[in-house]
Regions:
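HIT superfamily nucleotide-processing domains
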Residues: 1-556
């Protein structure tokens, strides 16, 4: 178990420097993890001079102070060269996973949050009702007409942000044709048919989808617009989970952008879940059960040991038995191609008035998953290795062992256990947010999203570290489910409304010490990504240790 340590920064400074010979291009691996079990942290406090090459001055007034003193711009036009003396510290932290770039922390921005980690949050928006505002200025008979005839960008914004159920209904009814009962209750959509293809009569799909993803839309409208099976297409339902108040459908996306198809676990119309606060542990269990079940069944069938079960889900006991049979079959004769799992969750939806879709989810809470083959046919007739994000970690493990003669995850866990503050101060040291005997939820030393969390399996199985869900027994899977739920609850508690979650898994049949890892990546309004992030340079305004404090407070 990891412990919160307060060891001297002297230990951190004993880490050998990064060795570089640019003439020979001999560069040590770009990771902050070291064989000494410490994080390598760089600090920039440069002093430098800038030659002034400006030819002309453009002096002018910017305005006045309350006493009418003129505020001008003369500071922008110095006469001579500029000398910068010891600029404020900028911390540079290589990501433990080199393919994820490098993080830069501005010490001035981070200082305020170090003094008060409670500043790390987003305030929840207040109520929004254009109908209520118009009601104080316009006759009631004209309000609906105004709302539904606003310029399209304004309707997009209202559809995304309104908390007024009635005006959302107005917008919904204005952008599609509905089937209603005699007393006006909507029960379905109207369809056109052309060349044997039926299509809902929707005037503006982006507006329709944005309204349908607003939690404040009445549930009956949610059901007929986005939740009812078939309303989003003809994807077959090939699995389900129903227990208590939880009902989830597993859709097959056979003609998928993911080769070999993928699956989507979506909540049924009987179990509407639009916010993380709506999610129960049973909900997460159901979502993940469908994932485990599909992967286990797929692998078992490829091994020729698939169960004869049809038209019902596997029980937890049957699922665990099948997992053990898979491991047994792989141990006896591992001729199966080295498959990998693919899992992701885009939580949250937003659409800007300028027409930008800000997140990929088309229904607030659903998860997607697939299997990745080992090989892909080459257009020239050969074969290439198929891409899986977990392979990037496998490559790193091999390179780390080659360069350092040490194990990456052993050293990574030691670095997490022995972490000291990034700024060298005496405040909170720990990056750990929550853990049990099987998994560790923590703040990465180098975050690629300003509020990134990661979940790492620390349990082992008979063959070594657990690197994929086939190697995870029932207890480890329960810990994973709980860790995923806690991560989402923490981020939602801080105010995050859009979170992308991904899995880095080891391929089947590989024994390289790789551990199963999940990353939770919120999208924040002030940090959507720009050229810095495109170059792998991630800019933060807090220290990771202080973000860990803010996260732990959400668990109280």
């Amino acid at each position: 178990m990891l412990k919160d340590t307060r060891e001297s920064c002297r230990l951190t400074c004993q880490v050998p420097p990064l060795s570089v010979d640019f003439a020979k291009r001999n560069l040590m691996l770009r990771t902050s993890v070291t064989p000494e079990g410490r994080f390598r942290v760089g600090i920039h406090t440069p002093s430098y001079q800038v030659s002034n090459l400006r030819e002309n001055d453009h002096l002018g007034s910017l305005g006045t102070l309350p006493d009418q003193t003129v505020v001008d711009n003369r500071e922008n036009f110095p006469d001579g060269d500029i000398r910068v003396e010891k600029a404020r510290p900028i911390y540079e932290i290589l990501n433990p996973l080199p393919f994820r770039g490098c993080t830069y922390i501005d010490s001035e921005w981070a200082a305020a949050r170090a003094a008060d980690p409670g500043l790390i949050k987003m305030d929840r928006p207040g109520p929004v009702s254009l109908r209520a505002i118009l009601g104080t200025h316009c006759p009631a008979a004209t309000i609906r007409e105004i709302v539904t005839q606003l310029p399209l960008p304004l309707r997009y914004e209202l559809a995304a942000t309104s908390t007024d159920a009635e005006e959302l209904v107005w917008l919904a009814e204005s952008c599609c044709r509905m089937v209603c009962t005699d007393d006006g209750v909507p029960v379905g959509l109207q369809y056109n048919e052309s060349n044997g293809r039926r299509q809902a009569m929707i005037d503006n799909f982006e507006l329709f989808e944005t309204i349908g993803n607003n939690p404040h839309l009445p549930d009956q409208y949610k059901k007929i617009m986005v939740l009812r099976p078939g309303v989003q297409g003809n994807s077959e339902i090939v699995g389900d989970f129903r227990q208590g108040a939880t009902e989830i459908f597993e859709y097959l996306r056979s003609n998928s952008y993911i080769p070999w198809g993928h699956y989507a676990a979506n909540f049924a119309p009987t179990s509407i879940r639009y916010g993380i606060a709506d999610l129960s542990p049973l909900d997460i269990e159901g979502l993940r059960h469908l994932y485990y079940q599909r992967v286990f069944i797929t692998v078992a069938e490829k091994l020729g040991i698939g169960p004869a079960i049809r038209r019902r889900p596997l029980t937890p006991a049957e699922l665990e038995t099948l997992r053990q049979e898979i491991l047994g079959a792989l141990a006896v004769d591992n001729q199966l191609e080295s498959l990998a799992t693919l899992w992701g969750w885009n939580f949250g939806y937003d659409f800007s008035g300028s027409g930008y879709r800000l997140h990929a989810s088309h229904q607030m809470i659903h998860q997607q998953y697939a299997m990745v083959p080992q090989w892909v046919d080459d257009t020239c007739g050969g074969q290439n290795e198929a891409y899986s994000s977990g392979d990037l970690i496998a490559d790193l493990i091999d390179r780390y062992r080659q360069d350092y003669h040490s194990d990456l995850f052993t050293d990574y866990l030691a670095a997490l256990a022995h972490n000291t503050r990034t700024d060298g101060g005496g405040g909170e040291q720990s990056l750990v947010v929550w853990q049990d005997r099987n998994v560790l939820l923590f703040v990465p030393k180098a975050q690629v999203s300003q509020w990134e969390l990661q979940l790492l399996v620390i349990a082992d199985y008979a063959g070594g570290p657990v690197g994929n869900i086939i190697e995870a027994d029932a207890a480890v899977r329960r810990s994973l489910d709980m860790g995923i739920l806690k991560a989402q609850q923490i981020l939602a508690g801080l105010g995050a409304t859009m979170v992308s979650s991904i899995e880095y898994s080891k391929r089947l049949g590989v024994a390289n010490g790789q551990r199963l890892l999940y990353a939770f990546l919120p999208k924040l309004p002030w940090s959507m990504g720009a050229f810095s992030e495109a170059q792998g340079r991630f800019i933060l305004g807090h220290y990771p240790e202080d973000f860990a404090v803010a996260c732990r407070r959400q668990l109280r």
